[in-house]
């Protein structure tokens, strides 16, 4: 978990099912607070929902750092299917483009991270880069993400793991 040390440090849809919210929200956060570093943590499915917004980053020179957690799945949908629908999986595997090459076509620097030991150097490079940056981080295909807000619930009912609610 990431421990925030100051207020007004996170923008979230709060589990309201707004897949694709992240990239436009990060762009808006950076435009609204240009002096702050804005990092977007997003899955490959969520990024693909609004990937055309990379054009906004290019056109307006928005310095957003994108940490793409790439598992080649619609990960949260798959997680819901596993936890709440008795592992009846449907339509969640994804065949993805080369995200670093795609970012480059928008003038955005990028890098692939395939092993954990590459991560520290890659993050340092991303944060020191002046301008937008996409860090494509390969993560476990079937890993789950917590905390999470179950569908139809609210942030006061977050799940901390498979068996524990807050």
What role is predicted for each listed range?
Residues 1-166:
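Thiamine diphosphate
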